[in-house]
């Protein structure tokens, strides 16, 4: 059996040795003793050095006495006599807790005579004792390490030859690392703070309150814009963290933070160990300064920040060189002079070195000759001024240009054309391959080219192509005579059309929004173009024959509106039907009501926005050609701000390049595009959390003003379909807060509409858009719905109107109000009319007619009664009546019931002349001109009464021009006759 661990530590009995002696076994020699040093895991592994002969006698004696004291008396005597005792007699009982760790011995300290100032709990006392023990152990361990370092610093001569002398640096670093831990006395600080009196605490609170009031009432920057912000390299401050405190001299704090972020730095709010620099202005926070001094964080001023940007971007050296050198004008001639001067100086230096090598230092006469040969610096400058203009031009210009130099006027015109052109026109694509986002076999460019190249083959009149299915994907457009290119602006629709026409050799005739495109113009001018021949190739001198191949391009078709373009869309559709040439139409909004009728006659090609990477490559190539340095990240920001608009992105880059001192911050302000968002997109941005990351308060408020009438309705309709971020327990509280905000916004809108207080619109934007978006910030869980309030409001208005009409019609026989008619009369009236029709059929028609006659109801009032009494999910009572019975009721009603005064068919349209009908007799009796005037009015009245057009029950044909002329002649003769009679009486 195996022995237990306790058996190794038990003391052996004395009989064991006697037994061995009796058996005659010789005892084995005691092995040499070795020291085992136990090292804790917390301390460094320090190996004790071997014992040396220089040890003091007192220490050896004391150690020997301890060993002898631990052994029995006979063994101690042998040890004193110099004899080695047996191993078995030296063994003593060992407690396992001493080897494997056990309870620590408690030190009993006498109680203090005076009481402590504060009474601590047991945990606080234990912490303080542990920290004191640690401090003492660290202090005691330090001299031991020094001793070890001294012993190790004297190596053996063999090792000294092989090893290189290295100073014991790791020991010193360890000791240094431990020193700050000793200095930190957190419990002492806690004691001091806890010992503070009430007066001191009050003083601290008062001081902090004063500092907070100073912070609230702090002034802005002292001299805004007085210092120029250095233009550093991008990401020159990457990896550095900053904290800005106080009021700077020429910048606001937010402006300084934005400058740091532009160059790749990170801005923090709290001073900590990870902080690299603290930027300080006036009235800086004292706590931040104290913590920065404690952690040895470098403190910078505003000028120090600018110097750091220059230093990190390598501008400091250039600035020093510019200060040393005098100011010179930056002209092309001086640049050439500098280049030539440097070349001549280098050649002079080479000549000097060659002369030194040839002649050496001994030949003084040769040196004097060389010095005399050199001319004065003024003469060299005059000579050099004449040299560069010839040498540089000769190198650049080829021989052909020398023989036939261009005239200065033509050269100037060409340069002016190139320089004055906008970048959009200067760098527009010249071939189909250069169009952005239109590569591949399935692109719209390929489809348009295929359709246009086969147009004359498909429409030659021999065989009519078959109309394709509206949902066909692989339609090549052979049936259509026109093509419709639709898509957002600035993505290359017009460029695609013009380049495809040019590639196939067609001549284009273009009409855009600046031209009048009315029905008359299209009929007179465009219709003649559809059958004409083109002479453009003949006049341009391209050697082409007169061609019949030309294309009509109608740009911005959705803009054909107003009086100028009245009837233009219908005429364009008629021209497409009978056209003998291809027509290419372009529009931005394909869902426009006018375009829906045009789509049925056109080959539909929808253009999508190019991807950001495609536009980025094009713009970076333009920047390289124009020698404009801009970071790719900045280009991506501009493209995203313009909503992937190629034209506007290029215009923004050109605007940035126009200013040489344009910083990246100014570029951010320029790179904005006002987009017209629909209500669905606005609601999505109001509630989506991802959109809120890059939006300020002003941006959130601007969403409301895209359509301030519909925006609150969309928010109210869809806020319950949003799942907000955060804890699910807070969802109901957020919904309640959103409902309160919407109700307050509705009150503000009521005040705006009632009192025309339009200055309250920003307040309504806060309650109706910003607050609901903040409370319910998350993501949509369903589809965005159209506001149901609009439909319900129109339905309630319609029912109120129908109830008012019923109340007016039945007012002769009833005495109730409009509400009583709707609630009490309407169900029973409808039941009395419909029940005989449903039971008896056509025989019940007279009974139904009697009820309608008694209450003076119209035939349309029956439908109004059905609508007022029916509820959602309830069937109409007229559904049980046969259709033939309904028709019989309508016929009998039209025959028997006379038209009421309020019926739609009754009455004749009145004119203002009828108001003077009562005074006609008096006008006839009056003398003189009044008599003539009265006769004139009476004749007009008679004609109005006889005019059948004014009777609503009779549909008369329009009177011809001849009848109007005859009527006019009669009126003229009667008026002249009356005038002659009046003159005769006089």
From Swiss-Prot:
Residues 962-979 have a biased composition (Low complexity). GO terms for biological process: dendrite morphogenesis; DNA repair; DNA replication. The keyword Transcription regulation applies. Residues 917-932 have a biased composition (Acidic residues). A motif (Nuclear localization signal) lies at residues 955-959. It is found in: Nucleus. The modification Phosphothreonine is found at residues 60, 71, 197. GO terms for molecular function: ATP binding; ATP hydrolysis activity; DNA binding; DNA clamp loader activity. One of its GO terms (cellular component) is nucleus. Keywords: Activator, ATP-binding, DNA replication, DNA-binding, Nucleotide-binding, Nucleus, Phosphoprotein, Transcription, Transcription regulation. Pfam families: AAA, AAA_lid_RFC1, BRCT, RFC1. ATP binds at residues 487-494. The modification Phosphoserine is found at residues 18, 28, 40-41, 48, 58, 62-63, 128, 137, 149, 154, 156, 164, 194, 938-939. Interacts with C-terminus of PCNA. This is Replication factor C subunit 1. It comes from Drosophila melanogaster (Fruit fly). The lineage of its organism: Eukaryota, Metazoa, Ecdysozoa, Arthropoda, Hexapoda. The gene is Gnf1.
